[in-house]
């Protein structure tokens, strides 16, 4: 594994832990050259799953897109990277259990919103505003009112 700081190829594993659901391994590594530490994640490569976009286009499932969306929604919120990784792992596992070959982007978005709503309401509203394409203040108010009623 190449060091992200000095680009050295040689590093040693300092600590390894399974994710909460066992779908990935988190490894702390130390670079042999610069001695800085960094984290890597290892997971099993799964069978191909296609995502059907709103316009009907199909593209390969990319868990990084889900993680990036969750990370943007959780920016400056008390949600750790490990929690975000666990959310993505949970979503990916559910998708692979429910769908064999293809899944709609709408189904993925709903799963993300469900998990964010349970974890952090501000992150949920942030994600929903982009996912549901809020165009005015009333859209935000309606979503917040729905959260208050739960």
Curated annotation (Swiss-Prot):
Keyword Transferase applies: no
Domain of life: Bacteria
Record Pfam families: ATP-cone, Zn_ribbon_NrdR
One GO BP: negative regulation of DNA-templated transcription
UniProt-recorded Gene Ontology molecular function terms: ATP binding; DNA binding; zinc ion binding
Zinc fingers (unnamed), renumbered ranges: 3-34
Cofactor: Zn(2+)
Cofactor note: Binds 1 zinc ion.
Keywords associated with the record: ATP-binding, DNA-binding, Metal-binding, Nucleotide-binding, Repressor, Transcription, Transcription regulation, Zinc, Zinc-finger
Lipoprotein in keyword set: no
HAMAP family registered for this protein in UniProt: NrdR
Function: Negatively regulates transcription of bacterial ribonucleotide reductase nrd genes and operons by binding to NrdR-boxes.
Stated family: Belongs to the NrdR family.
NCBIfam families: transcriptional regulator NrdR
The protein's name in its UniProt record: Transcriptional repressor NrdR
Organism: Syntrophomonas wolfei subsp. wolfei (strain DSM 2245B / Goettingen)
